[in-house]
Amino acid sequence: MDWEEVTKLEENEYKRGYDEGILKGIEQGYEEAFLFGLEHAYNKYLLAGEIYGRVCFWLKEENSQHPKIKKAHRHLEQLKSLLESLPTNNELEETDAGFDSYWNKITAKAKVVSSLLGTKILPAEKIDANDGFE
């Protein structure tokens, strides 16, 4: 080891550690983001499936004669249509609305149906209140 290497040892080790940290951060960041997205998508689609099941149940022939369901029939059909058109892939064309806009329409329509039927459809607490960031 010559004198110049000795004097720059700390600087070289710092740079090497910094570069290694950047690479590890990029690698782990993608993995964490993927898992975070997967978890939140699962929760939202699970709730969408539950709402869809309730809507299908209410729209059945024997249930559709109930006065409250008769009153909410049009809204139930619209909610069912929204749930059936919910995007299930990440490749959306520019003209298509994204998942969040569909989700906002679904929750708004579910609230209308909920008030008309006098039953709770959505959970009381917000599903993504803090989006995982505390």
From Swiss-Prot:
The keyword Nucleus applies. It comes from the Eukaryota. It is found in: Cytoplasm; Nucleus. One of its GO terms (biological process) is ribosomal large subunit biogenesis. It holds the Pfam family Yae1_N. One of its GO terms (cellular component) is cytosol. Coiled coil: none annotated. Keywords: Cytoplasm, Nucleus. Transmembrane segments: none annotated. Its main location: cytoplasm. Residues 17-53 are annotated as: deca-GX3 motif. The complex LTO1:YAE1 may function as a target specific adapter that probably recruits apo-RPLI1 to the cytosolic iron-sulfur protein assembly (CIA) complex machinery. May be required for biogenesis of the large ribosomal subunit and initiation of translation. May form a complex with YAE1. Belongs to the LTO1 family. This is LTO1 family protein C191.08. The lineage of its organism: Eukaryota, Fungi, Dikarya, Ascomycota, Taphrinomycotina.
